[in-house]
Amino acid sequence: MYGAHAHAPVSQGRERPLTVHDLNELLLVCSLVLLVAVAAVRISSRSGLPSLLVYLGIGVAMGQDGIGGIKFDNAELTQVIGYAALVVILAEGGLGTKWKEIKPALPAASALALVGVAVSVGVTATAAHYLTGLEWRQALIVGAVVSSTDAAAVFSVLRKIPLPARVMGTLEAESGFNDAPVVILVVAFSHAGPVEHWYVLVGEILLELAIGAALGMAVGWLGAWGLRHVALPASGLYPIAVMAIAVVAYAAGALAHGSGFLAVYLASMVMGNARLPHWPATRGFADGLGWIAQIGMFVLLGLLVTPHELGDDILPALVIGLVLTMIARPLSVVLCLTPFRVPWQEQALMSWAGLRGAVPVILATIPMVGGVEGSRRIFNIVFVLVVVYTLVQGPTLPWLARKLHLGQDADAAADLGIESAPLERLRGHLLSLVIPPDSKMHGVEINELRLPPGAAVTLVVREGTSFVPLPTTVLRRGDELLVVATDPVRDAAERRLRAVGRGGKLAGWLGTNGDTPDR
């Protein structure tokens, strides 16, 4: 029987049921792991390494070859938990995606997610077959598994170097879109029997993507409409409802034989750009769930690895990773982005920024569950590849961005985090915001905000003291503002507040607008 065998006594040939004492021990271990993982984020942020490596290391240390000595080999459980975690991670990523930023990058990102994946799979699989001796089915699985990129890993090392919107938008949209076709390819290659003809496979991929996209957009729009028109009795219910709607999108897409991963990403993106009530609270809740999902998933994947078995697979992993990084990824980027006249500097950065993260290691469990011959070797190769090339690419990304002179827009003012609470019976909204340290709203008088008729600043909280402001009250950094707006002018009031936060009191004349909602 697979699973974690931690010296648990058995009764009548079966594992004994979980007791309260076992639960207490489990909660203690899980909470300690979470605390260690949270503390490790500080180390990873200073070193420039994506945090996924730290979490994987924690899992390996807890495993049978580490200090924990836990034997865990349940690939099916890992796959199920990994899928659930990936749904949460994609939902959090979609909620934080600004439509205005990725809209110009959609054609290029779509090309990378479809044509780019095909090129990457073909080149990498060919190299894996001829250079490492893998059978064609195994080589195709490896090529498909490692073709998925992880923008979260990229942004974790580039967060201190703001990039042009096109680069960030392309990387973010690509990572959200390419998971779906890659999952379909891995499942198809891992299925028993001959692989479908390429045109049949392409047709199935396009059909599943279309179903997933349609359901995701529909569920997201309906969910956003409902949350904007129904006043829930407690603010804490809004984040729960948003995440539940995102999971509904995934489940509906998967059960309809579409791409559930694309559905959850698009549904979350629709809701993330709909100016929902209590948005900062929702983003904070989703961000916390995303961290928990990442920590749990990577620790579990680390547990599944058996380090003493990796020795024979290190060289093949390095060879495949070298071809992927130096040939397949750059070729995909050049073929897909050159028609869109993307400058070579941006192409170079996006070629190097194809970091692999959670998805490849999760997808490597699919052939293990399917009983594909050599599946354990596939998992080991993918694991080594992800770890080694993340160690190489992660710390060098900021250096490359500076060398290519792409670290610009660093002095842009921070957006305001505006939280909106509906006042259903009064047919209005209460907007709450805090002026960030670098906001250009600092030094602006209340009357210089020029809010639309029907909106007014009713209260200012400064250093723990609240007062009703006068028209001549000067706003300062750290002030919390409460703004009451009627339903018809709520959106206009939010846009004006964001515009002043970005451009100061002359925002309207200088062309600064507030159309993009806060993340």
Regions inferred by a protein language model and the residue ranges of each:
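Soluble N-terminal domains of membrane-associated systems
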Residues: 483, 488-496, 505, 511-512, ...
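Short, intrinsically disordered terminal tails adjacent to the first/last structured region
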Residues: 1-16, 504-519
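Active-site proximal loops enriched in glycine and acidic residues that flank catalytic Cys/His/Asp
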Residues: 363-365, 389, 437, 461, ...
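Transmembrane helical cores of multi-pass secondary ion antiporters/exchangers
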Residues: 2-412, 423-425
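Cytosolic Rossmann-like ligand/nucleotide-binding regulatory domains
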Residues: 442-488, 493
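Short, solvent-exposed amphipathic alpha-helical segments in soluble enzyme
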Residues: 340, 367-368, 405, 449-451, ...
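A structural micro-motif recognizing beta-strand termini
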Residues: 433-440
